[in-house]
Amino acid sequence: MTFSPEPAHQHGQPPRTAILLINLGTPDAPTPKAVGRYLKAFLSDPRVVEIPRLAWLPILHGLILPFRSRASAMKYESIWLREAHMTGSPLLVYTERQAHALQLLMQQQGHDVTVACAMRYGNPSIESVMEALRRQGTEQILLLPLYPQFSGTTTATAFDEAFRVLSTWRNQPELRLVKHFHDHPAYISALHKQVGGYWAQHGKPDFARGDKLILSFHGLPRRLLDLGDPYHCECLKTGRLLGEALGLQPGQFQVTFQSRFGKAEWLQPYTAPTLAELGKVGTQRVDVFCPGFPADCIETLEEIAMEGQSEFRLAGGQDFHFIPCLNDAEAWIAGLADIALQHLQGWPLNVPHPHELEARRSRAQARGAGA
C-alpha cells in the first residue's frame, strides 16, 4: 500500500477540530447517466446488498441499472430544486444548509469548530472532504452520520469508508463516532416541534373520528433484523417516544416502513399498503412524517408526498398531509449541536489568541523543534 504525503507542518498551529456530517448520497443531476452512476456505487456496496458478488453483479449491471436509472431519473427530476437560493438535489441542499447552520451556531456559542458535510455515495465524497480537512490541519474529527437509527446498511458503511480513507494517511487524526441518536432528547424534541409546528399552521388531525399519524421509516430486508441489525428496534423506540411527546394514544399513530426493493420480505407493516388500507376504510385525514430522514429527499418528497398521497386518495381517502422533514429547522440545528457537543467533550474547541500562537511558533523555532 502507498501512503500519501502529509501537508507541511506549521509551528505553533493549534489542533483543529471538525464535525463531519455524513448522509447517504444523491446523483449529480436528474439524468439517467448521473442516476446510473449513483445507483451503481450505492447498490455495489456489500453492506447494502448482502448477496454474493458473483450472483449480484450480473443482475445489477444486466437488469437493474439499465432499466431503473431512467425511471429513477424521472423521479429525481420531479423533486429537483431550481430556486434561486436552493438549487440541486434536495438531500444535498438541505444537508449543506444543516452544516452551514450548525457552523454558525457553534461559532455563536464560542466554539471554533469546522463543520463539513459529505455523502457516502456521490459528491461531495467522504474522501474529498476528509482530505480538505487534513489540509486545514484538522487533528480531531467527529463523524456524525445523519442516520438517527443505526443500521449496518447506512451508518456502518459510512464508518467503513472513513476508515478506508484514513488507512492511506501517514498522520491520522483522532476520530470519534456518533453511532446513533434515535432516543436522544434533543432529537425527539426537534421531531416534536416539527410536527407540532405543522399542526399549528395546518390544523391537527381529528383523532377522535379516526384520523391517523403515520411515522414512515426507510425499510430493510427482514433477514437483517434476524441477523442482529438493531435498526427495527430503534425505529420503534423513536416512534414511541415521539408519540408520547405528542400526547398520542397507541391507536392514533403507527410506525410503518417504506422503500421496499425486490421481492424478499422487508420490515413490516409497509407504508404504501397501509395508506391504501386507511383510504379504503374511509379515513378522512392522514398525516405522514418521516422521522428517520433528517433531510427531505426522493424517499420523502416523491415516494411519500406524491406516490403516498396518490395511494391514499385513490383508495378513497380524503385529506393527506405530508409533514416536511427536519431539514434546517432551528430546533433541529440546536439538537445537532447538543448531540455533537456531547461527543466533543475533552477536545479543544477554542483557538488560542493570535499572540499566544505567535509565541508558540517563536518558541518552537528557537528550539528547533518539530512541533
From Swiss-Prot:
Residues involved in Fe cation binding: H218, E299
Example of a GO MF term: metal ion binding
Keyword Transmembrane: no
Catalytic activity, EC: 4.98.1.1
Subcellular location(s) per record: Cytoplasm
CDD domains, A to Z: Ferrochelatase_C, Ferrochelatase_N
Catalysed reactions listed for this entry: heme b + 2 H(+) = protoporphyrin IX + Fe(2+)
Gene Ontology terms: cellular component: cytoplasm
Pathway assignment: Porphyrin-containing compound metabolism; protoheme biosynthesis; protoheme from protoporphyrin-IX: step 1/1
EC primary class: lyase
SUPFAM superfamilies hit by this protein: Chelatase (SSF53800)
Gene3D superfamilies, per the entry: 3.40.50.1400
GO biological process: heme biosynthetic process
Record keywords: Cytoplasm, Heme biosynthesis, Iron, Lyase, Metal-binding, Porphyrin biosynthesis
PANTHER family, per the entry: FERROCHELATASE, FERROCHELATASE, MITOCHONDRIAL
Summary of the function given for this chain in its UniProt record: Catalyzes the ferrous insertion into protoporphyrin IX.
Family to which the UniProt record says this protein belongs: Belongs to the ferrochelatase family.
The protein's name in its UniProt record: Ferrochelatase
Species, as recorded: Cupriavidus metallidurans (strain ATCC 43123 / DSM 2839 / NBRC 102507 / CH34) (Ralstonia metallidurans)
Protein's gene: hemH
